[in-house]
Amino acid sequence: MDSMNWSRLEQFGEWEFFGLHEIPGSPKNFHLVSKKEFRYQDMIASSDVMLSKIGYGVYAECLLNGTPLIYLPREDFAEYPVLAGAMEKSGTGYCLCREDYYNLNWDEALETVLSKGKSEPVSSCGAADCAAEIENIIRNRGHNSLLT
């Protein structure tokens, strides 16, 4: 990533970018943030779009917040096909080829996700959903006494 011409980031004049690591060239629209000061989850929730490698954490946070994800292929990651397939199926992701990423050819990806906007956030009440499902199973098996 050090070989990338990061100053070209300024070509995206309508966009402000922030990241956790310094980048060469000091583009005016890049802002370095600290994990100590900003939680990763809050950064995703307050972003219009996330540009990242795909993984369980970023996938889950993007779904929970309705934040579109522009991601890079991860053929070395066993779960990549499942996560990428889910992003494609939900319409909330955009796979950016490595060449376009490294050449900062992000126009199409940004325009595509911007035109779709944020999606409806996914419910994050998994514990309550699981408890309700367990109660349904107990009721359906006639063990109502276990619920009182």
Region locations from a protein language model:
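Donor-nucleotide binding loops and adjacent catalytic segments primarily
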Residues: 1-49
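General structural feature for long, well-ordered alpha-helical segments within catalytic domains
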Residues: 4-5, 9, 83, 126, ...
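A general structural signal for well-ordered secondary-structure junctions
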Residues: 15, 50, 93, 116-119
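Surface-exposed, flexible loop/turn segments at secondary-structure boundaries
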Residues: 23-25, 58, 77, 101
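Nucleotide-sugar donor-binding patch of glycosyltransferase catalytic domains
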Residues: 35, 65-113
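A donor-sugar binding/catalytic signature common to diverse glycosyltransferases
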Residues: 39-82
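C-terminal amphipathic helix plus adjacent low-complexity
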Residues: 107-148
